Amino acid sequence: MKRTFQPSNTSRKRTHGFRVRMSTKNGRLVIKRRRARGRKRLAVTIAGK
């Protein structure tokens, strides 16, 4: 049986990235909550250049 998690940076960013979060009201609430908690990463970011 195939595993459910097939990692892909593209789809990861498209569904959980910062710009996607900011595009909806609920997404902005997510960012707001994470800021309030003092999270180091507010949304999914791909390490690189």
From Swiss-Prot:
PROSITE patterns tied to this protein: RIBOSOMAL_L34
Source species, domain of life: Bacteria
GO molecular function, one term: structural constituent of ribosome
GO annotation terms (biological process): translation
GO cellular component: ribonucleoprotein complex; ribosome
Entries under Pfam families matching the protein: Ribosomal_L34
The entry's keywords: Ribonucleoprotein, Ribosomal protein
Family: Belongs to the bacterial ribosomal protein bL34 family.
PANTHER family found in the cross-reference section: LARGE RIBOSOMAL SUBUNIT PROTEIN BL34M (PTHR14503:SF4), MITOCHONDRIAL RIBOSOMAL PROTEIN 34 FAMILY MEMBER (PTHR14503)
NCBIfam families per the UniProt record, alphabetical: rpmH_bact
Official protein name in the record: Large ribosomal subunit protein bL34
Species of provenance: Geobacter metallireducens (strain ATCC 53774 / DSM 7210 / GS-15)
Gene this protein is translated from: rpmH
